Amino acid sequence: MASMQHFSLAALLLAASICLGDADRTECQLPLDKGTPCTQEGGVKPSVAWWHDDKSGICLSFKYTGCGGNANRFTTIKNCEQHCKMPDRGACALGKKPAEDSNGEQLVCAGMREDKCPNGYQCKMMAFMGLCCPTKEEELFAREYEGVCKSGKPVKMDRGSGWMMTILGKSCDDQFCPEDAKCERGKLFANCCK
């Protein structure tokens, strides 16, 4: 009985931390705002910054023009991820709903045991459990997140959070690619190609 009380208390604390954690992260839901060019002499020069795209659930790069903008702007991808991506939260790619049982409850799966998921769904592990997510969207998101260059050239990588990662943005209009790379638009994201 005591272990059940401990489990209930832990679940309550986790739920509270998730709810309270989201309450002070409203800036992460703001749309991209590139700001405006600074007109004052000695103003901030344009630079690459990151914003949290609430729809995709990831941090994307863009060219910040130097002045103004909103609070959904971070100087590094690491800062963006630490502030906006809850490590104990998870969701299916592109905001798609996980599979549900006949009672409307989300189907829970474990690891690579996709036999627990209906056809067209795959097990996606979250922090504490797995959900059955639509396979088509999960595969598209994974492919796009790694970056694809239609030109056949390699994707430009950067040491963003301490490891090599693809430089991604929402659109080539966001002008986030370094000078030695060309932006190419994919189905979901834009990435930099060598």
Curated annotation (Swiss-Prot):
Disulfide connectivity for this sequence is 28-84, 38-67, 59-80
Keyword Signal attributed: yes
* Primary location: secreted
Q: Where is the signal peptide?
A: 1-23
Where is it located?
A: Secreted
Q: Which Gene3D superfamilies match?
A: Pancreatic trypsin inhibitor Kunitz domain
**PROSITE patterns the UniProt entry points to:** BPTI_KUNITZ_1, BPTI_KUNITZ_2
One Pfam family assigned to this protein is: Kunitz_BPTI
A GO cellular component entry from the record? extracellular region
Picking any one GO molecular function of the record gives:
serine-type endopeptidase inhibitor activity
Alphabetically ordered keywords of this record: Allergen, Disulfide bond, Protease inhibitor, Secreted, Serine protease inhibitor, Signal
- Using the record's annotation, list all stretches that form the BPTI/Kunitz inhibitor domain: 28-84
Q: Which residues form the WR1 domain?
A: 90-134
Answer whether the UniProt record assigns the keyword Mitochondrion to this protein: no
The UniProt entry, under PANTHER family, shows:
BPTI_KUNITZ INHIBITOR DOMAIN-CONTAINING PROTEIN, PROTEIN CBG06772
Q: Which protein, by its recorded name, is this?
A: Major allergen Ani s 1
Protein's organism: Anisakis simplex (Herring worm)
